[in-house]
Amino acid sequence: MKLPNKLGPIHFIGIGGIGMSGIAEVMHNLGYTVQGSDAADNYNVRRLAEKGIRTFVGHRGENLADAELVVVSTAIRRDNPELALARERRLPVVRRAEMLAELMRFKSCVAVAGTHGKTTTTSLVATLLDAGGLDPTVINGGIINAYGTNARMGEGDWMVVEADESDGTFLKLPADIAIVTNIDPEHLDHFGSFDAIKDAFRAFIDNIPFYGFAVMCIDHPTVQDLVGRIEDRRIVTYGENPQADVRLIDVDLKGGQSRFRVMIRDRRPGFRLEMEDLVLPMPGKHNALNATAALAVAHELGVSPEAIRRALAGFGGVKRRFTRTGEWNGAQIFDDYGHHPVEIKAVLKAARASTEGRVVAVVQPHRYTRLASLFDDFCTCFNDADTVIVAPVYAAGEAPIEGFDRDALVAGLKSRGHRNAVALERSEDLAAMISGLAGPGDYVVCLGAGNITQWAYALPGELAALGEKAA
């Protein structure tokens, strides 16, 4: 039995979340009556309202109205008034991943998992399949610039989704093709140990049907180890590793883009295909690897090399992934979602390769638990930044943890040899600090999953205003 076509109003609690908003939009486009609430007004809430979806700011029981089904994200507490009333009324309550899984049953599905790179890779897979005429439905964890949204209804037989492993619910998703970009220690508050994370990813691969396959990056040692433990399922490996089925070769990172070629070698004797002169308008080897994963899927689904080449060259990127927000005094300012040490290191390495000027990193650590559990890694992931400006921790509802805060990170960076790590007292002070640091050819990269994105977009104007005031 599949999701009924006739279903009463569906109420989303936390509809402004990036994952929830995408599901809500697709269900609205399928003809379901959708409504929802969020604690605060944001871009996604406004975007959904513009599409005719009834939205509420703030959580109140009366928002449920005549809803017959409630969808909740894992961020919603049990004492939420809307959730409490729904349970009092004995309404069905489903988690975000359960509803996503129901939508996936309508199509053949590609699910993109991994600690980092999921959103960009999901966007790239969607772009390549679209270029091949497959017209996929897409539900992503970030805004795809070409669509202006994180969700899109396609007329084709395929759906491409980002599979969020943070709470383990990605194991509910019925994928025909599974991508694993990497596996690092993250979300330990849920999993408890790195071994538990690795076990979850193994289960994710084991869940694919016998006619499906997994695309896995063997440049990452944990993923390569997992490949060796998977039995009875087809695996397509990718990476710079000379043993990869889809091998990334000759990566050239200059001018804010990536040039490379890819060699495809099937396990069938004698099969070999080389794609040369590939260009991705995004910097960083990590993004070239993401593109290689997407290319592997597109090739398997019959997309031509020329369509792949054209789509990669025209890729418009994803919001909050090395997104340029403006320029001041010849310095470029960027916004990036990177909040894990592996992500931060990759972004700063890409910035370093893209400019001959200085790289100034502005970081807002996200969650005390993440800073504490990965503290040593945070203290060593900023080597490619000439200057690191550390803002107060964005708590995301967590209580402070003694010894793991802004000042501890500044001290940790310095003790491990960084030459210029400084604390930011208030966001209002950022423009003045940058004005004394950045000049022509420099990159200012704002990093974090909190509200630092707002600082990144405000910074060019604030710097210009400072200049006018000084004049």
UniProtKB/Swiss-Prot annotation:
Q: What EC numbers are recorded for this enzyme? A: 6.3.2.8
Q: Where in the cell is it found?
A: Cytoplasm
Family matches, as Gene3D superfamilies? Mur ligase, C-terminal domain (3.90.190.20), Mur-like, catalytic domain (3.40.1190.10), NAD(P)-binding Rossmann-like Domain (3.40.50.720)
Q: What class of enzyme is it?
A: ligase
Q: What keywords does the record list, in alphabetical order? A: ATP-binding, Cell cycle, Cell division, Cell shape, Cell wall biogenesis/degradation, Cytoplasm, Ligase, Nucleotide-binding, Peptidoglycan synthesis
One GO biological process this protein is involved in is: cell division
Q: Part of which pathway?
A: Cell wall biogenesis; peptidoglycan biosynthesis
Q: Where is the signal peptide?
A: none
Please list the residues that bind ATP: G114, T115, H116, G117, K118, T119, T120
One GO MF annotation is: ATP binding
- The residues that cross the membrane are none
Does the record bear Nucleus in its keywords?
A: no
Spell out the GO cellular component terms annotated for this protein, sorted alphabetically and separated by semicolons.
cytoplasm
Q: What Pfam families is this protein classified in?
A: Mur_ligase, Mur_ligase_C, Mur_ligase_M
Say if the entry is tagged with keyword Cytoplasm.
yes
Q: Which family does it belong to?
A: Belongs to the MurCDEF family.
Q: What does this protein do?
A: Cell wall formation.
In its UniProt entry, what is this protein called? Answer: UDP-N-acetylmuramate--L-alanine ligase
